[in-house]
Amino acid sequence: MTMPTKSFHRTDRVSAQVRRDLGTIVHAAVRDHGLPSVSVSDVEISRDLAHAKVFVTALQQERSAEAVKGLKEIAGQLRTQLARAMKLRHVPELHFHYDDSVDRGERIDNLLRDLDDIGPEAAPDAQDAEPR
């Protein structure tokens, strides 16, 4: 009996490696360039490995635009450092984006918590509702 195997494409492996290496590089660059603190949350690489969408989250959400702008300005330097760290013939061009999934998740969590605070007595009773 053969076990089903999950296929991992090269882009998935490269993406994971870029995320690990770039996470370390970005952490140092943020400190060196006085940028707001960010961390790399995800990396999506194009099939041809020419471009990488780098998603970052900011500790201070209100300074996220400043952080992404700063990373875009030093993207060439970061790509050079990434090339030194990785054994790839061509290192993808880096495109930085703010990852708002954490903010959206937090907003949903707050909404759910607010619903819990309201309690079931505020919800319309199923028997009182008119059929549609």
From Swiss-Prot:
Q: Which PROSITE patterns match?
A: RBFA
Q: Which GO terms describe its cellular component?
A: cytosol
Question: Where does the protein principally reside?
Answer: cytoplasm
Intracellular or extracellular location(s): Cytoplasm
Which UniProt keywords are given for this protein, alphabetically ordered?
Answer: Cytoplasm, Ribosome biogenesis
Gene3D superfamilies, sorted? 3.30.300.20
GO annotation terms (biological process): maturation of SSU-rRNA; ribosome biogenesis
| Entries under InterPro entries matching the protein | KH_dom-like_a/b (IPR015946), RbfA (IPR000238), RbfA_dom_sf (IPR023799), Ribosome-bd_factorA_CS (IPR020053)
In terms of PANTHER family, this protein maps to:
RIBOSOME-BINDING FACTOR A, CHLOROPLASTIC-RELATED
Subunit relationships: Monomer. Binds 30S ribosomal subunits, but not 50S ribosomal subunits or 70S ribosomes.
Role, per record: One of several proteins that assist in the late maturation steps of the functional core of the 30S ribosomal subunit. Associates with free 30S ribosomal subunits (but not with 30S subunits that are part of 70S ribosomes or polysomes). Required for efficient processing of 16S rRNA. May interact with the 5'-terminal helix region of 16S rRNA.
Q: What is this protein called?
A: Ribosome-binding factor A
Species assigned in the record: Xanthomonas campestris pv. campestris (strain ATCC 33913 / DSM 3586 / NCPPB 528 / LMG 568 / P 25)
Q: Which gene encodes it?
A: rbfA
